[in-house]
Curated annotation (Swiss-Prot):
This is 3-dehydroquinate synthase. Belongs to the sugar phosphate cyclases superfamily. Dehydroquinate synthase family. The gene is aroB. Zn(2+) binds at E184, H247, H264. GO terms for cellular component: cytoplasm. Its EC number is 4.2.3.4. Keywords: Amino-acid biosynthesis, Aromatic amino acid biosynthesis, Cobalt, Cytoplasm, Lyase, Metal-binding, NAD, Nucleotide-binding, Zinc. Its cofactor is Co(2+); Zn(2+); NAD(+). It comes from Shigella boydii serotype 18 (strain CDC 3083-94 / BS512). One of its GO terms (molecular function) is 3-dehydroquinate synthase activity. NAD(+) binds at residues 71-76, 105-109, 129-130, 142, 151, 169-172.
């Protein structure tokens, strides 16, 4: 068992990583006997894990209600969020309840936002079931719903009480979702840890076949990096923005193509190549390093080009609505070397459009 602490003073919390955590009531600390829980999951995961997690919580003396959401990025909406509030109010659940998010990024983000908002804030626990959510979205307290005009535009920073990562969940993950999660894994190597990127080049095949020790190390390293960044910059005023490598471009793809048509990791993968091409055009990143990124993404089965049917010009309106925009200027996360990156303002729209076009025609 691995345990990593996100250090935020009185709001610090553990990330527990191991196989078989769903069999142990103690995994779901700080829940105690007699407490009330609303377990939030989706229609795909409910048949796989709802009864098991409910059972282990009830074994610990916890009173469990549940709400099952539709599955898919297109359902990360205020309308679906309202079904969580309705379920809480119908019981009713008070301020002493705990929400448990059993699912991937959509379930985790919506549940966290519900917890931040319900009666002005109740406790919640993240139980991520996808690789993407285990290495990224479950850690750090970003919660949100999408809007038709932009991804994650309505939300709050609200930290969980704990994160429970059961590695066994990856055994039921569809291959496309596993590959999508690898985009966020590769991101950490590009922005923060060149040695980890080297390790990924050497161990990618083991990750694709769900090798236990390799996957455990991979998830632990990603969570360590994320925990360090969040502890240093919880509300994304500086360092934490680096975690958005590829996301300014990727969110544009998701919004333009319709949420769910491109998985988040797929869009981020293409976006990371666009960021690398932008950095190349600025003369601060080598084509050889861009090629290393492209090669690793391709080996993982991820796209390295944007959608053929989406013109370079179609990215700009979405990018100008990005949450990192300041004073009307797009701020981009750009690699400087494998393992080092920066937040860059003032890049001309023409250069950005040319970098996108590089990826469209590649």
């Amino acid at each position: 068992m691995e345990r990593i602490v996100v250090t935020l003073g009185e709001r610090s919390y553990p990330i527990t990583i191991a196989s078989g955590l769903f069999n142990e009531p103690a995994s779901f600390l700080p829940l105690k006997s007699g407490e009330q829980v609303m377990l939030v999951t989706n229609e795909t995961l409910a048949p796989l894990y709802l009864d098991k997690v409910r059972g282990v919580l009830e074994q610990a003396g916890v009173n469990v209600d549940s709400v099952i959401l539709p599955d898919g990025e297109q359902y990360k909406s205020l309308a679906v969020l309202d079904t969580v509030f309705t379920a809480l109010l119908q019981k009713p659940h008070g301020r002493d309840t705990t929400l448990v998010a059993l699912g991937g990024g959509v379930v985790g983000d919506l549940t966290g936002f519900a917890a931040a908002s319900y009666q002005r804030g109740v406790r919640f626990i993240q139980v991520p079931t996808t690789l993407l959510s285990q290495v990224d979205s479950s850690v750090g307290g970003k919660t949100a719903a999408n809007h038709p005009l932009g991804k994650n535009m309505i939300g709050a920073f609200y930290q969980p009480a704990s994160v429970v990562v059961d590695l066994d969940c990856l055994k039921t993950l569809p291959p496309r979702e596993l590959v999508s999660g690898l985009a966020e894994v590769i991101k950490y190597g590009i922005i923060l840890d060149g040695a980890f990127f080297n390790w990924l080049e050497e161990n990618l095949d083991a990750l694709l076949r769900l090798d236990g020790p390799a996957m455990a190390y991979c998830i632990r390293r990603c969570c360590e990096l994320k925990a360090e960044v969040v502890a240093a910059d919880e509300r994304e005023t500086g360092l934490r923005a680096l975690l958005n490598l590829g996301h300014t471009f990727g969110h544009a793809i998701e919004a333009e193509m319709g949420y769910g048509n491109w998985l988040h990791g797929e869009a981020v993968a293409a976006g990371m190549v666009m960021a690398a091409r932008t950095s190349e055009r600025l003369g601060q990143f080598s084509s050889a390093e861009t090629q290393r990124i492209i090669t690793l993404l391709k080996r993982a089965g991820l796209p390295v080009n944007g959608p053929r049917e989406m013109s370079a010009q179609a990215y700009l309106p979405h990018m100008l609505r990005d949450k990192k925009v300041l004073a009307g200027e797009i701020r981009l996360i750009l690699p400087l070397a494998i393992g080092k990156s920066e937040v860059r303002s003032g890049v001309s729209h023409e250069l950005v459009l040319n970098a996108i076009a590089d990826c469209q025609s590649a």
